[in-house]
Amino acid sequence: MIARFNYSSPLGKIGMQADEYGFTEVKFIDQSKENNLNPTYPPIKDAVKWLDDYFLGNVPLTYPQFHLNGTDFQQKVWQQLRQIPYGTSVTYGQLAQRLNSSPRAVGNAVGKNPILLFIPCHRILGQNGKLTGYSGGLERKKKLLAIENIKL
């Protein structure tokens, strides 16, 4: 079963999609399918609670289950992204060092992150803390960083 739900956030609608194993996609709605199905599906309910907490400025304590499809390298990058604590940021170069890879390869994998917010690619900055690309848009990235009190 595939469940889809649109969440209204302060930064716009967030489209979520989950299967029986967990979330397969979380994107801002201008990048996602517009369907409102199964809002009571347990993974969707868990995600809504997480998002409510997050947008209230609270550190979410539990995460919904994910069902990620990607290359081995992408999976490693996404796992590293999940290790970046709320309220902190790292550069592409720092993340690349952790993975013994190049910043460009890491950037490509970060750009393919299918689960925005929950896998916090918005916490990745360019060299010298410069604000760089985000599939949800740079204005949203700035606002997400501000929610977490991350200074640019």
For each feature predicted by the language model, list its residue ranges.
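Basic nucleic-acid-binding alpha-helical/helix-turn surface characteristic of O6-alkylguanine DNA
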Residues: 1-101, 151-152
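Residue-level detection of the helix-turn-helix DNA-binding "recognition helix"
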Residues: 111
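…primarily DNA-binding HTH/wHTH and HhH modules…
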Residues: 129-152
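Structural signal for hydrophobic
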Residues: 81, 121-122, 144
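Short Lys/Arg-enriched helix C-cap and helix-to-coil transition segments
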Residues: 117-127
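Ligand-binding loop in jelly-roll beta-barrel domains
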Residues: 114
